[in-house]
UniProtKB/Swiss-Prot annotation:
Subcellular location: Cell membrane
Binding site for substrate: 244
EC assignment: 6.1.2.1
Cofactor(s) needed by this chain: Mg(2+); Mn(2+)
Gene label: vanA
Native species: Enterococcus faecium
Domain ATP-grasp span(s) in chain numbering: 137-338
Superkingdom, natural source: Bacteria
Function: Required for high-level resistance to glycopeptide antibiotics. D-Ala--D-Ala ligase of altered specificity which catalyzes ester bond formation between D-Ala and various D-hydroxy acids; produces a peptidoglycan which does not terminate in D-alanine but in D-lactate, thus preventing vancomycin or teicoplanin binding.
GO cellular component, as recorded: cytosol; plasma membrane
Phylogenetic classification of the source organism: Bacteria, Bacillati, Bacillota, Bacilli, Lactobacillales
Binding locations of Mg(2+) 1: 305
Annotated protein name in UniProt: Vancomycin/teicoplanin A-type resistance protein VanA
């Protein structure tokens, strides 16, 4: 039987490049190679595409070939340059492990759409909406979902610090893994936080801090028949959750404890799962997403953010939540590819 050819993309130009490589390493180690034939496409930090033997920390130094994904639907694959000539490598389905800008904002999804190649994960629209936290909140609020109070600060805006009630969080509107995020406890800290966030995006979000515990829910599926993982819970000792920025995240977070399943009642976990599914549907997600929320003391659930391409590293939350629900990583990868092929 011919194996299904899966193009696995990783790396990229965003600040989450290294996280993406780690995700691809785990996907490569757990994909069923009897059923699938993986083709590994690494993208350098400067945006150069290369076909390589496998994802690893030093993948660029391995035997690589220049490669591009053709937008020609008839070609349905990759153009790979070998011995000064291009050859066509047919692709049946694409699995992007690209995180952050260009990876989960609709950009690469647009290229997949042009190429006619089915792909794992959310479409252009839902990817773009979920990448921009302000748009996420607008759509969610219209669906009756609670969100933090928020203000959008554009490139030339100079907000008056005294108008806010502190603490607030300042975030790049379109970034991930907590890059550029700062908690601001007083008015005199605001300008610095905004300038820090502007290193990652010209559009900034100021959010009113929300009390309660941080929880998350992994969602899998394309339609009404959605599968959810076990709810997880993040207990912060200080600062913000930023495991992907830490030196040795494989050894555990420096400032947080993640519990799966969350130390909550069955009723609370069930409400969180149902809310996650409601958010997923409202935003038009498909394939997969991790929905992060706050559970307040009064039982109210407030949306934090939606990650349409969550990490697949050994320490990432999405695969851990699914594993706790009985779906190990090899099965999860298989399900995602099958969902992509079904459309």
């Amino acid at each position: 039987m011919n194996r299904i050819k899966v193009a696995i993309l990783f790396g990229g130009c965003s600040e989450e490049h290294d996280v993406s490589v780690k995700s691809a390493i785990e996907i490569a180690a757990n994909i069923n190679k009897e059923k699938y034939e993986p083709l590994y496409i690494g993208i350098t930090k400067s945006g150069v595409w290369k076909m390589c033997e496998k994802p690893c920390a030093e993948w660029e130094n391995d035997n690589c070939y220049s490669a591009v994904l053709s937008p020609d639907k008839k070609m349905h694959g990759l153009l790979v340059k070998k011995n000064h000539e291009y050859e066509i490598n047919h692709v049946d389905v694409a699995f992007s492990a690209l995180h952050g800008k260009s990876g989960e904002d609709g950009s690469i999804q647009g290229l997949f759409e042009l190429s006619g190649i089915p792909f794992v994960g959310c479409d252009i629209q839902s990817s773009a909406i979920c990448m921009d936290k302000s748009l996420t909140y607008i759509v969610a609020k219209n669906a009756g979902i609670a969100t933090p109070a928020f203000w959008v600060i554009n490139k030339d805006d100079r907000p008056v610090a005294a108008t806010f009630t502190y603490p607030v969080f300042v975030k790049p509107a379109r970034s991930g893994s907590s890059f550029g995020v700062k908690k601001v406890n007083s008015a005199d800290e605001l300008d610095y936080a905004i300038e820090s966030a502007r290193q990652y995006d010209s559009k900034i979000l100021i959010e009113q801090a929300v009390s309660g515990c941080e929880v998350g829910c992994a969602v899998l599926g394309n339609s009404a028949a959605l599968v959810v993982g076990e709810v997880d819970q993040i207990r912060l000792q200080y600062g913000i959750f930023r495991i992907h920025q830490e030196v040795e995240p494989e050894k555990g977070s420096e400032n947080a404890v993640i519990t799966v399943p969350a130390d909550l009642s069955a009723e609370e976990r069930g409400r969180i799962q149902e809310t996650a599914k409601k958010i997923y549907k409202a935003l038009g997600c498909r394939g997969l997403a991790r929905v992060d929320m706050f559970l307040q003391d009064n039982g109210r659930i407030v949306l934090n953010e939606v990650n349409t391409l969550p990490g697949f590293t050994s320490y990432s939350r999405y695969p851990r939540m699914m594993a706790a629900a009985g779906i190990a990583l090899p099965e999860l990868i298989d399900r995602l590819i099958v969902l992509a092929l079904k459309g």
